[in-house]
Regions:
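Short amphipathic alpha-helices in soluble, non-transmembrane regions
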Residues: 8-9, 42-43, 215-220, 256-267, ...
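FAD-binding subdomain of flavoenzyme oxidoreductases
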Residues: 111-112, 116-225
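A conserved active-site cap/scaffold subdomain adjacent to cofactor or substrate pockets
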Residues: 215-272
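Short, surface-exposed ligand-recognition loops at beta-strand->loop->(often short) alpha-helix junctions
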Residues: 1, 204-212, 252-253, 297-307, ...
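Conserved glycine-rich FAD pyrophosphate-binding loop
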Residues: 61-72, 116, 268-404
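N-terminal accessory segments
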Residues: 1-26, 42-57, 344-367, 371-376
């Protein structure tokens, strides 16, 4: 049976587009939306289950599947419209490649996602992973105008487009953002761009954690909002103390004004980085957790950071911690047993803080789930959505987890 399916895949995609991964799992590399759809129709007909991949840095290779479907063949930057500040790209385009192309037109995608530079744009959107710039430019969903996706049974859906539209009913584009591939394979994305800032300045300050969070509240109360205000644990910054990093971006005059307000308001000894050191620092911050066994994000408001930081310290190892000091949000990277993650999720839920398991070995993902337990009434809705977009459960994605 498996040889017959592989032969049909080779006939469909070409021999060079079907191989095996290091563990012997068949891997398909379709190069168009139509090819992805045809692959999934064949897989659905054959009863196979599918593991979705970009460049393979986010999905665990031990996820049990009959086929690994990678978007690496979807690597074209389709259109870039500087006048409209919009780009259309395929999901397999690496983020560093997109950055270089947009810079040619003095534009950028205002995202600094964690992970390796070659992470695909599709994986960033599917996991909704954002870095420090989320505080100033918004989460991943704010940068995605529309998309093309393919369902588990091979149907092509195209919600949204290259302009912002107000549409009654459910926002299908936002459903795909952060859905971890449970609702379809992203193949094409329409992205909102920005002009490159004329000035980009980073300030660093070192102090005890409680003092830094207090200063962040002072800045917020004073209406000072840099594009990033990130609280970093010693393990992230390779320092002996916690660090607060403030990043101001925009016109030269606007940045100068923001810097002056920060220095006037914040009771800290700030150190301004030159361009080269700032680039190296943010590269370190973005990629510090790439080798961690698992990463977790918590949707905490800035006012609740101190309490959540204490909870994380009590129930997980010290790990690496990134926290949005002005707008909230926290990420942790390290290693933890499933029962410790469940305990933290339960305690966070009591405080109205969602916990998302971003990355982990498959056994942990399956036990804990990306989202875990839902509020009353939400679980059945998610199950119904999965039935719509993956009616025969072809995608290997653990959203809810399995209780012990």
């Amino acid at each position: 049976m498996s040889h017959d399916v592989l032969d049909r895949l080779r006939s469909l995609l070409g021999p060079a587009s079907v191989s095996r991964d290091p563990d012997g799992v068949p891997r398909a590399v379709p190069d168009s939306t139509d090819a992805v759809a045809a692959t999934l129709r064949l897989v659905d007909e054959s009863g196979w289950r599918v593991r979705l991949e970009g460049h393979g840095s986010w999905v665990p290779p031990d996820a049990s599947a009959d086929l690994a479907l990678t978007t690496r063949g979807l690597d074209r930057i389709v259109t870039v419209h500087p006048a409209d500040l919009v780009a259309t790209v395929e999901a397999g385009v690496p983020m560093d490649v997109l950055r270089r192309r947009l810079a040619d037109d003095r534009m950028w995608l205002a995202l600094d996602p964690p992970g390796r530079p070659e992470r695909t744009v599709g994986s960033i959107v599917a996991t909704a992973t954002a870095g420090a710039l989320r505080g100033g430019f918004g989460p991943v969903r704010d940068h995605v105008l529309g998309c093309t996706a393919v369902t588990g049974d091979g149907r092509v859906i195209r919600p949204g487009g290259t302009v912002v539209k107000n549409v009654a009913g459910y926002d299908l584009t936002k459903l795909q953002v952060g859905g971890f591939g449970a609702f379809g394979v992203l193949t094409t994305l329409h992205l909102r761009l920005r002009a490159l800032p004329a000035a980009d300045v980073t300030l660093l300050a070192r102090a005890p954690r409680d003092h830094l969070t207090s200063v962040a509240r002072d800045l917020a109360d004073a209406g000072v909002q840099p594009q990033a205000l990130e609280l970093l644990s010693p393990a992230v910054s390779a320092e002996s103390e916690w660090i607060m990093a403030a990043r101001c971006m925009g016109s030269a005059g606007g940045v100068a004004g923001d810097l002056a307000r920060i220095l006037d308001t914040a009771d800290l000894a700030w150190n301004e980085l030159d361009v080269e050191r700032a680039h190296a620092f943010w590269h370190l911050v973005t990629h510090a957790g790439s080798g961690a066994a698992m990463t977790v994000r918590l949707g905490v408001l800035a006012a609740g950071l101190d309490e959540l930081l204490d909870l994380v310290g009590q129930h997980l190892d010290e790990g690496l911690i990134w926290a949005g000091a002005s707008q909230g949000g926290m990420r942790w990277a390290g290693d933890a047993a499933p029962e410790h993650l469940r305990t933290l999720r339960h305690l966070a839920a009591e405080r109205e803080v969602p916990l998302t398991l971003e990355r982990a070995p498959w056994a942990v993902r399956r036990a804990v789930g990306h989202f875990g337990a839902y509020r009353e009434g939400v679980g059945p809705l998610v199950a119904q959505l999965r039935e719509v977009f993956d009616p025969t459960s072809r995608f290997v994605v653990a959203l809810g987890g399995v209780e012990p």
